Amino acid sequence: MMKKLTMFLCLACAWMCSLQAQEAKTFFKNMPDSLSPLLTAVNRADFIDFLESKMKAEVTNRFGGKSEMTELASDYIRIQMTPQSSWQMKLLATSDSTKVICTVSTACAPACDSDVHFYTTGWEELPSSSFLTPPVMKDFLSLPDTVMDYEVRDAGEKADMLLVKADLSAKDNTLTFTFTTTDYMDKEAAEKLKPYLRRPVVYVWKEGRYELQATSNE
């Protein structure tokens, strides 16, 4: 009887360890320094320790500034790297039961713009096109060719660079892109475009890639 109990406890422990090894925090700790130039390995470990101890997870980064991990879940991490930049990570299951890591790096100066990347759990970069078809200008700005207002058309021409802020969700497997091009434009031109702006573009993770969920003209 004792042998069976011991074997059961060993198997349960191994199962729990296996689950923990698949959590975002484990992959985050093992992230190569080359992909985390602002944070040291000690910084990354301290983030986890602080949050798990119910403490504010703020560290002094490699360049002497303050960085704070603001969210930690089994499959999600968010860090405020600097006052103007943030980093997010999401652990996503693929159709063949393996997992990939999605990261979003956002910088605001002052308009926010994000870069989305995908990696294996060993932090080898994967082609983004295999997992996401990114949104384009027309997904956010619906400016009909029939618009005759010169000021509106002029404002549309000033929106010549697509800037978007991407956000991974801690609660589900969605990825949301918000149009930020108007944040770098002059206020008057941005106001002219407001009636033609669509809602944020939302993608949902399905069968190993992000699929467009909804866009709206509202």
Residue ranges of model-derived segments:
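Bacterial Sec-dependent N-terminal signal peptides
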Residues: 1-27
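Surface-exposed loop/turn elements that mediate protein-protein interactions on large endomembrane-trafficking
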Residues: 66-78, 120-129, 207-209
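Mid-length scaffold segments of soluble, non-membrane domains
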Residues: 100-135
